[in-house]
Amino acid sequence: MKVVTFGEIMLRLKTPENLRIMQSDGFEASYGGAEANVAVSLAMYEDKCAFVSKVPNNPVGMSALSEVRHYGVNTDYLVRGGDRLGIYFFEKGSDIRNTNVVYDRAFSAFSLSQPSEYHWENILEPGDVFYFSGVTPAVSKYVEDTVRSALKY
């Protein structure tokens, strides 16, 4: 049995300290996304897991892929294509100001995923756990259709 997670990995740009985006002249870059984070957490406990997504076939997409692989997550079923990785900007709250997150994921490689790009019959085996967050099918109609196709297996 393995856990298969399906979702978008994004470039996370965080303002330094507690600065707002408008106050910052730079960002700290990392990668994140609910399903990627779950896969990494499971891999750290040496559980068998795979992360399924779509990233652009460029240095940013390959860097995101490398980050997940670094923790021992299987990325064999990851699709490469599209033009851009989704981005989110993170402002840490302080005192009375709440944390703020701004998403820029329209037309990301993942949001344009097509069901035909994923061969679920080869990815999911009987007894596997399939994990996706509630946001995933809401990313786009294409992704919703892709989730529906996976659920048939």
Which residues does each predicted region cover?
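Ribokinase/PfkB-type carbohydrate-kinase core domain
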Residues: 1-4, 69, 97-153
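Glycine-rich phosphate/adenosyl-contacting loop at the front of the ribokinase-like
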Residues: 1-73, 110-116
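Glycine-rich beta-alpha junction loops
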Residues: 9, 82, 107
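A common structural microfeature
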Residues: 48-49, 84-87, 100
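Short beta->alpha junction loops/turns
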Residues: 54-57, 82, 136
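A glycine-rich helix N-cap at a beta->alpha junction
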Residues: 65-85, 94
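C-terminal domain-closing interface element
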Residues: 88-98
